[in-house]
């Protein structure tokens, strides 16, 4: 069994950029120990000779056929904009220089 200290939990929280209150340390310490014990079990499994896999079940993408669909006339779209400038939508500036 792994031994995790309160300082270890604080360090992991800091590395993960989590604001972990001190009263939560006691809750997360045994949980982190169990996670590390499980990882140790996984590391002990002999995978020599097994082909690498990325998922347990092979997945096939199901996509629709591409097709041409009618689109609104550009002028109709531009006329619906709150503001426009010529053939462009005018939007508020969000970045300075």
Swiss-Prot record:
GO biological process: glutaminyl-tRNAGln biosynthesis via transamidation; regulation of translational fidelity; translation
Gene3D superfamilies membership: Glu-tRNAGln amidotransferase C subunit, N-terminal domain (1.10.20.60)
Keyword Protein biosynthesis: yes
Catalysis performed (reactions): L-glutamyl-tRNA(Gln) + L-glutamine + ATP + H2O = L-glutaminyl-tRNA(Gln) + L-glutamate + ADP + phosphate + H(+); L-aspartyl-tRNA(Asn) + L-glutamine + ATP + H2O = L-asparaginyl-tRNA(Asn) + L-glutamate + ADP + phosphate + 2 H(+)
Record-level Gene Ontology MF annotations: asparaginyl-tRNA synthase (glutamine-hydrolyzing) activity; ATP binding; glutaminyl-tRNA synthase (glutamine-hydrolyzing) activity
EC number(s) given by UniProt: 6.3.5.-
SUPFAM superfamilies: Glu-tRNAGln amidotransferase C subunit
Class of this enzyme: ligase
Keywords of this entry: ATP-binding, Ligase, Nucleotide-binding, Protein biosynthesis
InterPro entries: Asp/Glu-ADT_sf_sub_c, GatC
PANTHER family, alphabetized: GLUTAMYL-TRNA(GLN) AMIDOTRANSFERASE SUBUNIT C, MITOCHONDRIAL
SUBUNIT field: Heterotrimer of A, B and C subunits.
Function: Allows the formation of correctly charged Asn-tRNA(Asn) or Gln-tRNA(Gln) through the transamidation of misacylated Asp-tRNA(Asn) or Glu-tRNA(Gln) in organisms which lack either or both of asparaginyl-tRNA or glutaminyl-tRNA synthetases. The reaction takes place in the presence of glutamine and ATP through an activated phospho-Asp-tRNA(Asn) or phospho-Glu-tRNA(Gln).
Family, as annotated: Belongs to the GatC family.
UniProt protein name: Aspartyl/glutamyl-tRNA(Asn/Gln) amidotransferase subunit C
Organism: Synechococcus sp. (strain RCC307)
């Amino acid at each position: 069994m792994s031994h995790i200290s309160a300082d270890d939990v604080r360090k992991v929280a800091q590395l993960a950029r989590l604001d972990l209150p001190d009263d939560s340390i006691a809750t997360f310490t045994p949980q982190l120990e169990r996670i590390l014990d499980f990882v140790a079990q996984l590391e002990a499994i002999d995978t020599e000779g097994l082909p690498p896999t990325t998922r347990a079940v092979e997945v096939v993408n199901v996509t629709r056929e591409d097709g041409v669909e009618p689109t609104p006339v550009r002028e109709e779209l531009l006329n619906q904009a709150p503001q426009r400038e010529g053939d462009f939508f005018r939007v508020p500036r969000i970045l300075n220089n």
